[in-house]
Structure formats: structure tokens, C-alpha cells
Regions:
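Redox-cofactor binding/interface segments in oxidoreductases and associated redox assembly factors
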Residues: 22, 82, 193
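ATP/nucleoside-binding phosphotransfer catalytic cores, i.e., glycine-rich phosphate-binding loops
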Residues: 163, 168, 179-182, 230-303
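Gly/Ser-rich helix-loop-strand patches that form or flank binding pockets
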Residues: 91, 96-106, 113
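Short glycine-rich anion-binding loops that position phosphate/pyrophosphate groups of nucleotides
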Residues: 27, 86-88, 111, 197-199
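Catalytic core of DAGKc-family lipid kinases
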Residues: 110-189
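Gly/Ser/Thr-rich active-site loops/lids in small-molecule metabolic enzymes
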Residues: 184-188, 193-229
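ATP/NTP phosphate-donor binding region
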Residues: 1-79, 91, 119-136, 145-155
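Short glycine/serine/threonine-rich phosphate/pyrophosphate-binding segments
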Residues: 31-32, 87-92, 200-205
């Protein structure tokens, strides 16, 4: 069984799709109904529907579904339909990227910037089966914390890594290096290291630039900087960014990736951020450009 392959042209016909994973936001009300509706559309095209054990906790009966572990689901699925918002896609991206499985997001959240479809557009899932799609490959970050000679934290991020003080009453002092060469020292609440995908999230709210996905830059944006400092730095994806926190006044500093639980740093830790070896593959079936989506979701340029 082969996953849908990346396209060099704008469109290509996909091979036979046999299995589709449905990944719902299990913490959202009404998700059982959404799963059943999506499964009905997928089955109309002759494919089997995969759920993981976690999905059964929302009241779905296993009858008619293939119930797999997450790892087996990643191996078996031809593509994934994520039912939720951007947070659900971020959680799935880390799981799917090493297996190169494409993701089709169906928004049941708020802005849903990464989602391709709104829930009333479920039937457009059929375009994937008909070969009417493109794949948008999104750069990810590899984030690791080195403590002495030991890697004590490592993860991937589709949006951003955030290094931030744990108290609203303390400021942090962070030394930023690029390929081990000093760039600056940032005083403030912290720093956001973002992908182009994450440039329209927390980074944008902090005053960072909007970066189109194909640019593949790494941006470094201070959070509430103290004093006169640049609002952002842009680096090549081939660079390695290192953040060295300085600890004083009993400060606590955490690193978090894509909104996941923070990992507490200690004196002497080095946080390394670089382009990840994998990417997130987002299915597109509507043909919207990045800028039309930007205007739609963020109402930029509208009266």
C-alpha cells in the first residue's frame, strides 16, 4: 500500500485509496456525529474507515470501523481526515509527518487557518478520491534541549517553539545564536521561533511578519521586548538557531512546541531549533491561494 505521493505538478490522479483515518478532537462536543457523517462520505467511495482507540471514547461504536493503534493507523492510512481546529491538526502533524501521510483538515473550531474544509463542505472529501487535489508541504522545526551532553527534550513543531518566562512578573534574558555565532540578547517575556505556517499564529500577534509557506524561513520574534530591539529576525532554513537562557532572580523559563505542555529549563541548558527532516503534508481540494485564505481567515484588507 502506497501513500499519496507528493506532486511536482499542480494536480495528479491518486492511486486506489483503500483506508482513511478519521482523527477527531475528542474533547469537543458533538464529535461523534461529525465522525459518522465523515465516515459515510468516505465509504461512498469504497474506502474503509480507520479509528484509533482514543476515538472510541466519544461514544462511537467500533462496528464498521477498523480500530488500530496510532502507529498502525499511520502505516495503513492513505490519508487522514482531521475533524477539529488548528490545534487538532497540530497534534496530528507530529504523528503523521514521519510516515508522510497527507492530512485533510475539516474545521469544527474557530479560525481554522490550516483546515481546508468547513464541516458543511464534508462532501468535498470526494475530490481526493477523484484526484482533484494538491499537496501543500509545510516545513517543520526540530526542537531539542541539550543539558550538558544529554538531550533531555526533543520534539517537532509545525507552528512554533516558544521560550518564555514562567511568571508574568519576571522578564527573561535570552542569548540568540545562529550557527553558534551570537546574534543578539533579548530582554522581555520570551521569544517565538516560528515556521512560515506559524507566522500567522502567535508570531503574528507578537508583531512578527507574515511569511508565505514556500519561503521556508525560520523567524525569531521577541515577546514584549524590553528596550529598543528589532521586532523580528529571519533566518535561512539551513541555519541552526540556539537559545541560551540566563537565569537570575529565581526565574523559571519553559520551552513549549505547538501549544503542548511546557518543559522547564535549567541553568546551562541550550535550546536548539533547526529545520526538521520531515514536513507536514496538507491536502488542498479547493484551489484557494495562500493570500486569499489569509484575507478570509484574518480579514486583512477587508472594509
Amino acid at each position: 500500500m502506497e501513500h499519496l505521493q507528493s506532486m511536482t505538478n499542480k494536480q495528479k490522479k491518486c492511486g486506489t485509496i483503500r483506508k482513511v483515518l478519521l482523527w477527531p478532537n475528542t474533547g469537543k462536543k458533538g464529535m461523534a456525529f461529525a465522525v459518522r457523517q465523515a465516515a459515510e462520505v468516505i465509504r461512498e467511495f469504497g474506502a474503509q474507515v480507520i479509528l484509533t482507540d482514543l476515538a472510541l471514547t466519544i461514544g462511537i461504536k467500533p462496528d464498521g470501523f477498523l480500530v488500530y493503534s496510532v502507529q498502525k493507523a499511520m502505516i495503513e492510512a492513505d490519508f487522514i481526515v482531521v475533524l477539529g481546529g488548528d490545534g487538532t491538526i497540530l497534534a496530528m502533524a507530529q504523528q503523521a509527518a514521519p510516515y508522510h501521510v497527507p492530512i485533510l483538515g475539516v474545521n469544527l473550531g474557530h479560525v481554522g487557518f490550516m483546515s481546508e474544509l468547513e464541516f458543511p463542505e464534508l462532501r468535498l472529501i470526494g475530490r481526493v478520491f477523484n484526484g482533484e487535489y494538491t499537496i501543500d508541504e509545510r516545513m517543520m522545526l526540530d526542537v531539542e534541549v541539550l543539558r550538558g551532553e544529554e538531550i533531555v527534550y526533543r520534539t517537532m513543531a509545525l507552528n512554533e517553539a516558544i521560550i518564555k518566562t514562567g511568571s508574568i512578573f519576571r522578564i527573561s534574558l535570552l542569548d540568540i545564536l545562529c550557527d553558534r555565532e551570537p546574534v543578539c540578547s533579548l530582554h522581555g517575556d520570551g521569544v517565538i521561533i516560528s515556521t512560515p505556517t506559524g507566522s500567522t499564529a502567535y508570531s503574528l500577534a507578537a508583531g512578527g511578519p507574515v511569511i508565505e509557506p514556500s519561503a521556508e524561513n525560520i523567524s525569531v520574534v521577541p515577546i514584549c521586548p524590553h528596550g529598543v530591539q528589532p521586532r523580528s529576525y529571519l533566518f535561512s532554513p539551513h541555519r541552526e538557531i540556539c537559545i541560551q537562557p540566563r537565569f537570575f532572580n529565581d526565574a523559571t523559563i519553559f520551552v513549549s512546541s505547538d501549544g503542548r505542555r511546557g518543559f522547564e529549563l535549567t541553568d546551562g541548558d541550550h535550546v536548539f531549533v533547526r529545520k526538521a527532516p520531515f514536513c507536514t503534508r496538507l491536502l488542498r481540494v479547493k484551489g484557494n491561494s495562500f493570500y486569499s485564505l489569509l484575507n478570509e481567515k484574518l480579514t486583512i484588507g477587508r472594509n
